[in-house]
Amino acid sequence: MEVTAEFLRLFLRGLYFISPLLLLLLLIIVLIGQIVGRHEAWSKFDALYWAFITAITVGYGDFHPRKRLSKGLSILTALVGVVFTGIVVAVALHAAQTSFAKYI
């Protein structure tokens, strides 16, 4: 139980310290989504949905860009999403290593 509590404490503290960067990446994802949505004539909700599905690299295929600019921005959205995910995973790994080293 102590390992879990320590992990959560370290993980949340790490996320807090890098929250400005994470918020910037989220803002980039939202802005690109709205640009693509306007360019493709999607609703704002559909554009936001597409942006986050693309950023987490799921890509259901129900919305897909048809225009060249939108296709380029979709690649950028996926790259930003991979960076976002990598940062969160790195923080989680650091928290796990530190908490395990302390208690195990």
Predicted regions mapped to residue ranges:
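Outer-pore turret/helix-boundary of cation channels
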Residues: 20-50, 65-68
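Membrane-helix boundary elements
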Residues: 1-16
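Membrane-interfacial helix-loop-helix connectors in multipass membrane proteins
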Residues: 4, 103-104
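Membrane-interface helix-boundary signature
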Residues: 12-19, 70-73
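Pore domain of cation channels
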Residues: 46-49, 53-103
